């Protein structure tokens, strides 16, 4: 039986940092989550468990060190402890000795790993988080918007109130550990009796198991339902902002708390404005005469309002005109940024004879040498 390469499963090198391992895990766990792979749920569940197993080992420095050194964590690998086949008694002796060296002495110094390699199936666990993307328009950044959301999630089973136990059946003593929460194993070797003790994997160390699993949820304490909420997108939200809705995720297992809902905001739609922080920037083209004499322009803001702005005489090409307090509200304080108009002075490529004559007169008044046609 080939051993699993946890590094290969997560797609990282053997020298990967904890942050690289964590990022790889987050990416893969989203990709292979069973709730996102309805068409091939069986494969997704297998991949999901495999990824969880790999991360459980590589994210723990002690377990990772053991894995790097021995190639496994927990129970003795299938091919360990063999030798001297065909010599009857000697085979058993050396098998015991191999088991002792590979398992019992290892556990004496490093602790029994079997508990951590198996998830406790009956203890409360928080539910998974849910990620959803929503689109908002540039105009909605000014006022904020409430968006109705509808999605599937696991909720607490109303029949058993999330306990996973059929009402009236109660809890009974675990038959494997007899209520102690731990299992004791004794093995006789030529060195004597070796004792192993580990957390019971049937009751998860609680010493109790359901008398009868809930007939509605199958013992998980949760069932799948359609959930509807209204999410408040605050004014001033930026593209790529992630809003956390506490308790909006899946219900936990066996009475565990709800996970969270993460709303990923995308700002969509065309606009002639550019956003920089909470400031709005707009390129404004004006005639050269207006640049010289000054003028007033009307700007249609993203929220539909019309703002009249005075352009001073003598404004230069590329100059920025600030209109204070007309930008986007800050998402936290509500204070608005500024509107910034970048002036683009338009020079005509052709003028009428009358205009040309007047311009020459102006040029002479300014002491310029004017070429006569």
UniProtKB/Swiss-Prot annotation:
Residue span(s) of domain J: 5-71
Annotated coiled-coil segments of the chain: none
Binding of Zn(2+) 1, residues: 157, 160, 214, 217
Compartment(s): Cytoplasm
Ranges occupied by CXXCXGXG motif repeats: 157-164, 174-181, 200-207, 214-221
Residue sites binding Zn(2+) 2 per the record: 174, 177, 200, 203
Matching InterPro entries: DnaJ (IPR012724), DnaJ_C (IPR002939), DnaJ_domain (IPR001623), DnaJ_domain_CS (IPR018253), HSP40/DnaJ_pept-bd (IPR008971), HSP_DnaJ_Cys-rich_dom (IPR001305), HSP_DnaJ_Cys-rich_dom_sf (IPR036410), J_dom_sf (IPR036869)
GO molecular function: ATP binding; heat shock protein binding; unfolded protein binding; zinc ion binding
Gene Ontology cellular component terms for the protein in this record: cytoplasm
Cofactor(s), by name: Zn(2+)
ZnF region ranges: CR-type: 144-226
GO biological process, one term: chaperone cofactor-dependent protein refolding
Cofactor binding note of this UniProt entry: Binds 2 Zn(2+) ions per monomer.
Organism superkingdom: Bacteria
Signal peptide: none
Pfam families for the chain: DnaJ, DnaJ_C, DnaJ_CXXCXGXG
Keywords: Chaperone, Cytoplasm, DNA replication, Metal-binding, Repeat, Stress response, Zinc, Zinc-finger
Subunit structure: Homodimer.
Function: Participates actively in the response to hyperosmotic and heat shock by preventing the aggregation of stress-denatured proteins and by disaggregating proteins, also in an autonomous, DnaK-independent fashion. Unfolded proteins bind initially to DnaJ; upon interaction with the DnaJ-bound protein, DnaK hydrolyzes its bound ATP, resulting in the formation of a stable complex. GrpE releases ADP from DnaK; ATP binding to DnaK triggers the release of the substrate protein, thus completing the reaction cycle.
NCBIfam families membership: DnaJ_bact, PRK10767.1, PRK14282.1
Swiss-Prot/TrEMBL domain comment: The J domain is necessary and sufficient to stimulate DnaK ATPase activity. Zinc center 1 plays an important role in the autonomous, DnaK-independent chaperone activity of DnaJ. Zinc center 2 is essential for interaction with DnaK and for DnaJ activity.
Record-stated family: Belongs to the DnaJ family.
Protein's recorded name: Chaperone protein DnaJ
Organism listed in the record: Thermosipho melanesiensis (strain DSM 12029 / CIP 104789 / BI429)
């Amino acid at each position: 039986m080939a051993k699993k390469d946890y590094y290969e499963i997560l797609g990282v090198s053997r020298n990967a940092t904890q942050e690289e391992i964590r990022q790889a895990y987050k990416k893969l766990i989203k990709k292979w989550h069973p709730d996102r792979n309805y068409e091939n749920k069986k494969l997704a569940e297998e991949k999901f468990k495999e990824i969880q197993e790999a991360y459980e080992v590589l994210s723990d420095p002690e377990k990772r060190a053991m894995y790097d050194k021995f190639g496994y964590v927990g129970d003795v690998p299938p091919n360990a402890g063999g030798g001297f086949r065909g010599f009857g008694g000697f085979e058993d002796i050396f098998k015991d000795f191999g088991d002792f060296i590979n398992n019992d002495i290892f556990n004496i110094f490093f602790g029994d790993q079997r508990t951590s390699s198996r998830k406790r199936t009956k203890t409360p666990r928080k539910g998974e988080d849910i990620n959803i993307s929503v689109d908002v328009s540039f105009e909605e950044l000014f006022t904020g918007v409430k968006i109705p959301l509808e999605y599937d999630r696991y909720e607490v089973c109303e029949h058993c109130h999330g306990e996973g136990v059929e009402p009236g059946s109660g809890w009974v003593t675990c038959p494997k550990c007899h209520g102690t929460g731990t299992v004791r194993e004794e093995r006789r070797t030529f060195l004597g009796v070796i004792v192993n003790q580990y957390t019971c994997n049937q009751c998860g160390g609680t010493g109790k198991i359901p008398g009868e699993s809930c007939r509605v949820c199958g013992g998980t304490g949760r069932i799948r339902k359609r959930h509807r909420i209204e999410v408040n997108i605050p004014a001033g939200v930026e593209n790529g902002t992630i809003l956390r809705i506490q308790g909006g995720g899946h219900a936990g297992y066996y009475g565990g708390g709800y996970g969270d809902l993460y709303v990923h905001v995308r700002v969509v739609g065309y606009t002639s404005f550019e956003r920089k922080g909470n400031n709005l920037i707009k390129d404004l083209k004006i005639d050269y005469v207006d640049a010289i004499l000054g003028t007033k322009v009307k700007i249609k803001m993203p929220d539909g309002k019309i703002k009249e702005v005075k352009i001073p005489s003598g404004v230069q090409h590329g100059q920025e005109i600030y209109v204070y307090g007309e930008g986007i509200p800050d998402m936290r304080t509500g204070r608005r940024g500024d509107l910034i108009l970048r002036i683009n002075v338009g020079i005509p490529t052709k003028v009428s004879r009358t205009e040309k004559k007047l311009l020459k007169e102006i040029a002479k008044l300014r002491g310029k040498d004017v070429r006569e046609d």
